Design a protein with these regions (language model features):
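Alpha-helical substrate-recognition element adjacent to the catalytic core
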Residues: 1-123
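C-terminal cap/substrate-recognition subdomain and adjoining C-terminal extension
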Residues: 72-180
Length: 180
């Protein structure tokens, strides 16, 4: 039996990590209740993700950039997540993370775990404060599916040898596109 390289792509919030990063940020801003209502509706597919993300991020306006380190300290990887990445890498597979969450929080974790590919939203910062805006294109349902295709192509993995793992409406397209 010959080796078949696979790409395993995981959602981040409440899948690879146990928390929702936006809710950790919202708690620091004192707007957790408002943000949680919007998050829940978006995860159920009742609200367009991009619109809901922009509404939630707007509520974070004025938070200091230092909040990212504080939130990162509160993040707990899902049990077995780090071991899974190490195992997949040791077997020659490729690991990617995609998130409707934020590069600002996850990048050090991605670097530490040597994740092969990563795509998430970037919160805008001006003069050390969050502006309440997202830079660039929003990582939504379609962007997660597109990332799977792009990462597989770059890693030279056939789509039939991709795996996608997620927990919400935002993950359905990438899961449908994956080979498993």
């Amino acid at each position: 039996m010959s080796f078949v390289k696979r790409l395993v792509q995981l959602d981040v919030d409440s899948t690879f990590i146990q928390q929702e990063a936006i809710e950790l940020l919202a708690a620091k801003a004192g707007v957790l209740k408002e943000v949680s209502k919007i998050t829940d509706a978006a995860m159920r597919g009742e609200l367009d993700f991009a619109q809901s993300l922009l509404a939630r991020v707007e509520l974070l306006k004025g938070l200091p950039e230092a909040v990212f380190d504080q939130v990162r300290d509160e993040i707990t990887l899902t049990d077995g997540a780090s071991d899974l990445v190490k195992l997949l890498h040791s077997q020659g597979h490729v690991v990617s993370l995609v998130s409707g969450g934020f590069v600002n929080i996850m990048q050090p974790i991605v670097d530490e775990l040597k994740i092969d590919y990563f795509k998430a939203n970037t919160l805008e910062i001006v003069d050390g404060l969050l502006t309440g805006q997202v830079l660039g294109s929003i990582v939504d349902r379609a962007a997660k599916a597109q990332a799977l295709t792009e990462f597989a192509l770059d890693a030279q993995v056939d789509m039939e040898n991709t795996v996608a793992i997620g927990d919400g409406a935002n993950d359905l397209d990438m899961m449908a596109l994956a080979g498993l």
